[in-house]
Amino acid sequence: MTVRNLFLLPGDGIGPEAMAEVRKIIAYMNAERDAGFVTDEGLVGGSAYDAHGAAISEGDMAKALAADAVLFGAVGGPKWDAVPYEVRPEAGLLRLRKDLELFANLRPAICYPALANASSLKPELVEGLDILIVRELTGGVYFGEPKEIVDLGNGQKRGIDTQVYDTYEIERIAGVAFELARTRNNRVCSMEKRNVMKSGVLWNQVVTETHKAKYSDVQLEHMLADAGGMQLVRQPKQFDVIVTDNLFGDMLSDVAAMLTGSLGMLPSASLGAPDAKTGKRKALYEPVHGSAPDIAGTGVANPIAMIASFAMCLRYSFNLVKEADDLEKAIANVLDQGIRTGDIMAEGCRKVGTAEMGDAILAEFKSLSA
């Protein structure tokens, strides 16, 4: 039996409650489908600070590095607002991304048909929407040097950020996008600002060359990032996979997420480079939503984003494509049945809590797996 090592970091706020629903699915898959998941659990964020004085301990960091994949809940809350900057809860996530060398951020924008009316756009524009935004996560203007505020000595100051990309950084993120497109609808749209930015010129050139050399079977389109934002709102279903840099990816993924009308239900993944020996990538999966400390412990949190993040984990880290498809279909079926947590409640639907939503999805998953 294949052993699949999964490290769970529930974190703070609603993270532990949402993670509990994933544990139910893992237990079922191990018991009934010989999935071979071996799980360990650690602390991250505020809970880690309370226990260790750090946003993640060295021991848990070592476990994350040794695992096949990390499933992450959420971090932060008002309790830790006054802790030193370097050990703030969010520093745990940043440390994981850095030490695992996660350079590719995958943000799906999926509009479940049952929730199409929740979007701010017309339902016909977003119903069935399924976009994947691939964002470069470790380069660009967020990390380029120099990065400083300079006192000019005349009562004026100058803020400096530096947008920097090397060829290899663009090649590897483009490769991820093209490979993912091959598993979807075989289309990639690369977005940059080559009309005003030299980094955009290089981005365009390298993506084009990478496509020609290795991925000519995939349909490639180039679009200026500002035009891409407009097209996401105008006609979002024209896109399949979008690949872009750190800054534009940060913005465009949030725009795309809001098209679905359910930002709090969306998953994400961050991937590293393939291991030279095994070909496996380090990976971290997490819901887009925050820790929601105001509802933590009340049993009303929506676990769908956490469960959908586990579905991404099944697909991208363990190549359990059928199981991932079934789990995503189970979520859609439960929503079609009118089952809702409070955050997505609508007239004529049945309101449930965290555990009942998780149980409903698990029951549907079991029926699809039979």
Swiss-Prot record:
Q: Name one GO molecular function term.
A: NAD binding
Q: Where in the cell is it found?
A: Cytoplasm
InterPro entries with a match to the protein in the record: IsoCit/isopropylmalate_DH_CS, IsoPropMal-DH-like_dom, Isopropylmalate_DH
Q: Which SMART domains match?
A: Iso_dh (SM01329)
Cofactor binding summary note: Binds 1 Mg(2+) or Mn(2+) ion per subunit.
Q: Keyword Oxidoreductase: yes or no?
A: yes
Keyword Iron in the entry? The reply is no
> GO cellular-component terms in the record?
cytosol
Q: Which cofactor does it need?
A: Mg(2+); Mn(2+)
Binding of Mg(2+) occurs at D226, D250, D254
State which pathway it belongs to: Amino-acid biosynthesis; L-leucine biosynthesis; L-leucine from 3-methyl-2-oxobutanoate: step 3/4
The site annotation (Important for catalysis) covers: Y142, K193
Gene3D superfamilies in the record: Isopropylmalate Dehydrogenase (3.40.718.10)
One Pfam short name: Iso_dh
In which family does this protein belong, per the annotation? Belongs to the isocitrate and isopropylmalate dehydrogenases family. LeuB type 1 subfamily.
What role does it play?
Catalyzes the oxidation of 3-carboxy-2-hydroxy-4-methylpentanoate (3-isopropylmalate) to 3-carboxy-4-methyl-2-oxopentanoate. The product decarboxylates to 4-methyl-2 oxopentanoate.
What assembly does the database describe for this protein?
Homodimer.
Tell me the protein's name: 3-isopropylmalate dehydrogenase
Q: Which gene encodes it?
A: leuB
